[in-house]
């Protein structure tokens, strides 16, 4: 007697899907289908599955039939349960903790996905399929893989014995259409006055460092800043995993290469930075500076390659410059700390700190100017800040972007480059009517000081 089956993760649904899957494997020579186009092979299997479902006599709606057929096709040709998540353009991250615990990130907030794998072996098979398609392998001798899918998505996989609870998979999806500065303004990540300053900074060939934590939106902002580079300039991009989507015509994209199975052939970012200097670049854009390449990047900025852009993992502008100092020491060059700080202060013009707030929104926290040196200390001044006022009833972070009232020294360089900013852009004028009554009752968050030394604790 036929029983009603809801197409979900129930045992009855999984049993039916497994039975149909086994029958397809038994009745079709899948190897013979490999030479066919995927559309042709999928159509043949879809027809077979439809006939099999008719024979099963299971009462199912047309939508349920379509879902179960698609699910089996995903198992045969795609990445199994991950396929609908990969196809959903509203999802930015897919995080597989265990075979039955899969989370997604949508609009900066994590949610349970509702999908699951049959068991650890099923998850391991999908991971192996993913990494093998990009020419990589994962096994006990090489239990970690960091790779890029053909569509640009970043994949990180780790398996036992390093992953204690079973195979783990993280996918950072690649946006087909890069966000623009208008998008960031609409999302509340930055304001139009800040965009004007950043556009002018790029045109005037200021060296810009973007700082933030994981998932804060560093690459997104770097992509936006890179879009401001004039189209008649030659750009060389250097990335560990290619994510930038530059629209200019004259772009050379470089990407690091991991070692092969024999442990040979590794090419790191430092080698690419050094090589890029021989490629007659007008601009060098480093996706993220992580190690010894920091010294070569700083030297490039100080020797005629103005207008370079990069990002770094750090929690504040001060930490960002301190991290650069640490990374320079990884190069093996024994330079005095004061000499390294002089290199940094003369190379970096602007530091942008961004963060992901508790409500999932990504915002620019500070736009700071590197002023110079006082003794052996780098000094900075904040030009724009995001002033947090508290948390609203709906969990949204309340706050506003405002200038600090300090006119940056780099405005002279902008004027020389033909960039004229509106008068009063840097004046700190309180919002009309002052702070809203509701906001005054919320807990306040201290605003960072306007000028901060780098090289000693505040």
Protein language model annotation of sequence segments:
Residues 1-111:
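N-terminal anchoring/assembly modules that precede and organize ATP-driven motor systems
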Residues 32-35, 55-62, 77-88, 130-147, ...:
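Active-site phosphate-binding and catalytic loops of NTP-dependent enzymes
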Residues 88, 96, 101, 105-204, ...:
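P-loop NTP-binding catalytic core
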Residues 175-186, 203, 223-274, 320-324:
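P-loop NTPase switch/communication element
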Residues 210:
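Hydrophobic anchor at the beta1->P-loop junction of P-loop NTPases
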Residues 218:
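Conserved lysine of the Walker
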Residues 239-252, 276-375:
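Conserved P-loop NTPase nucleotide-binding/switch module
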Residues 363-458:
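NTP-binding/hydrolysis catalytic cores, primarily Walker-type P-loop NTPases
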């Amino acid at each position: 007697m036929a029983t009603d089956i809801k197409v979900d993760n129930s045992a009855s649904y999984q049993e039916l899907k497994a039975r149909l899957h086994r029958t397809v494997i038994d009745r079709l020579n899948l190897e013979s289908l490999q030479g066919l186009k995927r559309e042709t092979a999928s159509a043949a299997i879809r027809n077979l599955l439809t006939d099999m479902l008719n024979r099963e006599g299971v009462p199912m709606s047309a939508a349920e039939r379509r879902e179960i057929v698609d699910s089996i096709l995903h198992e045969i040709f795609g990445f199994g349960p991950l396929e609908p998540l990969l196809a959903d353009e509203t999802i930015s991250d897919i995080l597989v903790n265990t075979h039955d615990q899969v989370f997604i990130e949508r609009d900066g907030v994590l949610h349970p996905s509702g999908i699951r794998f049959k068991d650890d072996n099923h998850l391991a098979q999908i991971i192996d399929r993913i990494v093998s398609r990009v020419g990589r392998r994962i096994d006990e001798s090489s239990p970690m893989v960091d790779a890029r899918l053909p569509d640009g998505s970043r994949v990180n996989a780790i398996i036992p014995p390093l992953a204690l609870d079973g195979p783990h998979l993280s996918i950072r999806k690649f946006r087909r259409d890069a966000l623009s500065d208008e998008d960031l303004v609409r999302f509340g990540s930055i304001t139009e006055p800040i965009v004007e300053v950043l556009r002018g900074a790029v045109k005037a060939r200021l060296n810009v460092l973007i700082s933030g934590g994981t998932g804060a939106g560093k690459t997104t902002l770097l992509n936006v800043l890179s879009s401001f580079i004039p189209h008649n300039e030659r750009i060389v991009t250097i990335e560990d995993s290619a994510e930038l989507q530059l629209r200019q015509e004259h772009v050379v994209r470089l990407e690091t290469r991991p070692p092969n199975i024999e442990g040979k052939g590794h090419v790191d970012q430092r080698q690419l930075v050094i090589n890029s200097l021989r490629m007659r670049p007008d601009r060098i854009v480093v996706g993220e500076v992580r190690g010894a390449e920091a010294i070569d990047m700083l030297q490039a900025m100080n020797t005629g390659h103005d207008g370079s852009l990069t990002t770094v993992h750090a929690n504040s502008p001060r930490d960002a410059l301190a991290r650069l100092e640490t990374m320079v020491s990884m190069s093996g060059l024994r330079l005095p700390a004061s000499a390294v700080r002089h290199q940094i202060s003369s190379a970096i013009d602007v530091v942008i700190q961004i963060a992901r707030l508790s409500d999932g929104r990504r915002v620019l926290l500070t736009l700071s100017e590197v002023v110079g040196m006082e003794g052996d200390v780098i000094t900075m001044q904040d030009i724009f800040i995001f002033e947090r006022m508290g948390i609203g009833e709906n969990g949204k972070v309340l706050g506003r972007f405002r200038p600090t009232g300090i006119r940056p020294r780099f405005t002279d360089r902008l004027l020389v480059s033909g960039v004229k900013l509106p008068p009063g852009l840097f004046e700190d004028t309180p919002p009309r009517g002052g702070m809203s009554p509701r906001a005054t009752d919320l807990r306040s968050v201290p605003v960072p000081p306007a000028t901060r030394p780098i090289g000693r604790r505040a």
